[in-house]
UniProtKB/Swiss-Prot annotation:
SMART domains: CBS (SM00116). Belongs to the SDS23 family. This is Protein SDS23. Induction: By the antifungal drug fluconazole. CDD domains: CBS_pair_SF (cd02205). The gene is SDS24. Keywords: CBS domain, Cytoplasm, Nucleus, Repeat. GO terms for cellular component: cytoplasm; nucleus.
Length: 628
């Protein structure tokens, strides 16, 4: 087991000695020893009158004035040892420094004037008003109002009449993962009742035009006029999808309603994090924040933004100390049954699996369940142009290699984001990784269960990236490792002794034959592995843990189960039965755009998709769906 991370040492400062004449000061410690006992699982509102501890930011970190009798000690000095990189990376960032702090007014001149020296010495004197005013009080996070998390930036939204292409361009232009969609007929900016468009909707759009989704898999209950017959609704849906395949514009509202989501929950900006934490801890990805009157949305709060806020302000929330220093195994959070995709399966299969499972990410593994990488629903944006459409029928590993090479070109350096931890990793380290990688989940691996070929290779590798089971820095697999293996996998698929590779792949997809272990590629040893995949920890798990600490009951799978129930509703099943009885919809039939209903194969899919990738809706240079 990895020892609990130790704190960073505080640099000695003359200011500390002059401002703490009444005994040693206690410094807020989120990673100290002895570890505090777990807080009681109940919600206890805090007030300013009962606060006994305040912290003051300095150039070396944060210090606090602790009331007599307080047992809350955070950082402990260990002069005999140096702080490890793991401890540093597991520690929350320091609180912001006040620009008016007198320490920033010290003159750097070699010949400072007498008056300036005098003013400086007076400003550093004990009991300085500036220091007192700069104190950060330690608070209960559950009492934080949502106004503290509402950004002043203009809220970006679109109208339901916008096309899918326009909605996609809005995400790209503003670097968003979702955007509110107004459904008001009178005011296009009215978000009182709204939907959301995200990359899962774009994935649905792509799969539809590729003939990869059956009518029975769609949520058509809310499509069109509620008073129309099942036959009329079926005709409307198929006609609209045919328009998409021909490259014509399709309203974004149509695609959104085909892909079930959780209700768009709203909170007043006067509400606190107490209730919001419960909602997001139950698997809802984002909520809307409204003004006091409740008639205008002022912001969107997502799981990712909330976890970043909690991390950046962790030193203000002493109740988090116990959890941040505990390991995943101790806290018993996370799932032991992550959804995966094999490295040699096609990318289109991964996208379809995310659609079916209603998840936004898959772990990429080899046949020995060694974690290879990660594929996200956001990655679908990289295959919306005709020049990249061939990647849909390449291996997932090949696509990961492409993403890494593109990232290297854009940022000018080789990178491999750390998307994995182990059961002995502290929650503080997990949150730090989630914030740094802007991820929604981290895969849990067991490094002791690596394949023998990997063990021997890693033993001979001087920079294996492992330190007592803890991954430090950017570990292998490096870009070159993934690229080399991707080439080997692709090469092996092109040298089948039975039949030509292209014909074999097309035949396999055309007949609907799934990729199995028997058709897998030869076993290429992955010499820079991470370990066996044993679980996954998500933002939902962590936020649910925080909510549970305040007495709230959460179920991390609640929102996902609701989405799955929506996708298989009895209402839609009854519609399908009615259509089948009338001879309109054969059982299990796919939505098609030609007379060949059975052709959902590789060659047919490429032909169908070529229209959407080449059709120019606006200006070619502005349209992500046009040929590049």
């Amino acid at each position: 087991m990895v020892n609990p991370p130790q704190p960073r040492q505080m640099p000695k400062s003359p200011r500390l000695s002059t401002s703490t004449s009444s005994g040693p000061s206690a410094v807020p410690n989120l990673l100290g020893s002895p570890r505090p006992s777990p807080p009681q699982l109940q919600h206890q509102p805090s007030s300013a009158s009962t606060s006994s501890t305040t912290s003051t930011a300095t150039t070396g970190g944060s210090i606090s004035a602790t009331a007599p009798g307080s047992t809350q000690h955070y950082l402990h000095h260990h002069p005999s040892r140096k702080t490890s990189i793991v401890e540093i990376l597991s520690s929350p960032p320091p609180l912001p420094t006040d620009p008016n702090d007198p320490i920033h007014q010290l003159s750097l001149s070699r010949h400072a004037s007498t008056s300036s020296n005098k003013s400086s010495s007076q400003s550093i004197a004990p009991g300085s008003t500036a220091i007192t005013n700069h104190a950060f009080s330690l608070v209960d996070w559950s009492e934080i109002p949502l106004t503290e998390l509402t950004e002043s930036n203009k809220l970006i939204s679109i109208h339901s009449s916008h096309s899918v292409q326009s909605a996609f361009e809005t995400l790209l232009k503003n670097n968003l993962t979702s955007v509110p969609v107004s459904i008001s007929k009178s005011d296009p900016h009215d978000l009182t009742n709204c939907l959301t468009f995200d990359y899962s909707d774009l994935n649905t759009y792509l799969l539809l035009i590729m003939n990869k989704i059956n009518y029975s898999e769609l949520n058509v209950d809310d499509i069109g006029d509620p008073n129309i017959s099942p036959q009329e609704r079926h005709e409307f849906v198929t006609q609209t999808i045919s328009k998409a395949k021909r490259g014509e514009e399709v309203p974004v509202e149509f695609i959104i309603k085909l892909h079930p989501k959780n209700p768009f929950i709203k909170f007043n900006e006067t509400d606190t994090l107490f209730s919001v934490m419960e909602t997001l801890g139950n698997g809802v990805h984002r909520i809307a924040i409204t003004n006091e009157e409740g008639n205008k949305i002022t912001g969107i709060l997502s799981q990712r933004r909330l976890i970043k806020y909690m991390w950046e302000n962790a030193r203000r929330f002493p109740s988090l100390d116990f959890y941040l220093t505990s390991t995943l195994q101790d806290l018993k959070i996370g799932s032991s049954n992550p959804i995966t995709i094999y490295e040699d399966q096609m990318l289109i299969e991964a996208l379809h699996k995310m659609f079916n499972e209603r998840v936004s990410s898959l772990a990429v593994i080899d046949r020995s369940r060694t974690l290879i990488g990660n594929i996200s629903i956001v990655d679908v944006k990289n295959v919306t142009s005709s020049k990249n459409s061939h990647l849909l029928f390449k291996s997932v590993l090949n696509f990961i290699s492409y993403n890494l090479s593109q990232k290297g070109i854009e940022e000018g350096q080789d990178q491999f984001p750390i998307f994995h931890v182990n059961n002995q990793t502290s929650l503080g380290r997990v949150i730090a990784k989630l914030v740094a990688t802007q991820s929604h989940r981290l895969w849990i691996v067991d490094s002791s269960r690596q394949a023998s070929s990997m063990s021997s290779a890693s033993a001979s590798a001087p920079n294996s990236g492992m330190n007592n089971g803890v991954t430090v820095g950017y570990p292998a697999p490096a870009d070159s490792s993934i690229t080399d293996k991707a080439e080997e996998v692709e090469a092996s698929s092109m040298s089948s002794p039975q039949l030509n590779a292209a014909a074999a792949a097309a035949a396999a997809v055309a007949t609907g034959a799934p990729t199995t272990a028997t058709s897998a590629q030869p076993d290429f040893s992955y010499t820079s592995g991470t370990g066996k995949l044993v679980g996954v920890v998500t933002l939902t798990d962590i936020l649910g843990l925080f909510a549970t600490s305040k007495g709230r009951r959460t179920d991390p799978q609640a929102a996902r189960n609701q989405r799955r129930r929506s996708s298989t509703s009895t209402t839609r099943s009854s519609i399908d039965s009615a259509l089948s009885a009338e001879g309109i919809l054969p059982s299990g039939s796919a939505i098609i755009g030609s007379s060949n209903a059975a052709n959902t194969g590789r060659r047919g899919s490429v032909e169908v998709s070529s229209d959407v990738f080449r059709k120019s809706y606006t200006k070619a240079q502005e349209n992500a769906f046009s040929k590049e």
